Regions:
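A short, charged, amphipathic alpha-helix used as a generic interaction element across diverse proteins
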Residues: 48-65
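Intrinsically disordered, low-complexity regions
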Residues: 1-4, 31, 35, 60, ...
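Hydrophobic alpha-helical segments with strong N-terminal bias
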Residues: 7, 12, 29, 33-35, ...
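A short, structured beta-strand/loop element
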Residues: 16-41
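Short N-terminal "domain-start" leader segments
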Residues: 1-25
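A short, exposed loop/beta-hairpin motif centered on an aromatic-Gly-Thr core
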Residues: 37-52
Length: 74
């Protein structure tokens, strides 16, 4: 399994306080399993800029992919 076997969708949204929160969806393409978000998943932020929120979400997504490659979740 490689990083190409995953789809990472990283974006952001604005919270009620006007700050930016990262949004993330990570899907394992081989079986369609959504690895993130999950029940109780952490909130990614808030951050002062949309770019920081998006970058944090993308970085978290890459970490999830690396972790799943090393130790696949069934």
């Amino acid at each position: 399994m490689s990083a190409e076997d995953f789809a990472i969708y990283a974006s952001y949204q604005i919270n009620a306080g006007g700050l930016f929160v990262g949004t993330l969806k990570v899907i394992r393409k081989t079986d369609g399993r959504m690895l993130f978000p999950f029940q109780g998943a952490p909130v990614l932020g808030p951050y002062p800029s949309r770019q920081e929120a998006r970058d944090a979400a993308a970085t978290h997504g890459e970490l999830i992919v690396k972790s799943d490659i090393a130790n696949p979740e069934s």
